[in-house]
């Protein structure tokens, strides 16, 4: 018999996370590694757990996640987005709480491109009057 699974895709900056929620005891596996092994910073671990804590589902699901692209902060945000979307597949009544917390919104902020004639996206070379 097939297990019940809930899928969600999350994105943030250049990161894309494919998240599966499987009924279990609360393990969070990211790219075949435990949450504590994958993210060193406590703030990133907290970001990943936020939707589960908000909806009181922290011990009910195992989170299996494949994430690629970007840095650690972007990946943590993408996982949070993916978990939130997967929770909606589990129970649509969680939508108001998740939406109010802002977990369903795809953060549109991206790195601004570097322009020619400038050192960075907006940083101009030093100006000399004489």
UniProtKB/Swiss-Prot annotation:
One of its GO terms (biological process) is translation. PROSITE patterns: RIBOSOMAL_S9. Residues 105-130 are annotated as: Disordered. One of its GO terms (molecular function) is RNA binding. Residues 111-130 have a biased composition (Basic residues). Disulfide bonds: none annotated. Keywords: Ribonucleoprotein, Ribosomal protein. GO terms for cellular component: cytosolic small ribosomal subunit. Pfam families: Ribosomal_S9. PANTHER family: RIBOSOMAL PROTEIN S9 (PTHR21569), SMALL RIBOSOMAL SUBUNIT PROTEIN US9M (PTHR21569:SF1). Belongs to the universal ribosomal protein uS9 family. This is Small ribosomal subunit protein uS9. The gene is rpsI.
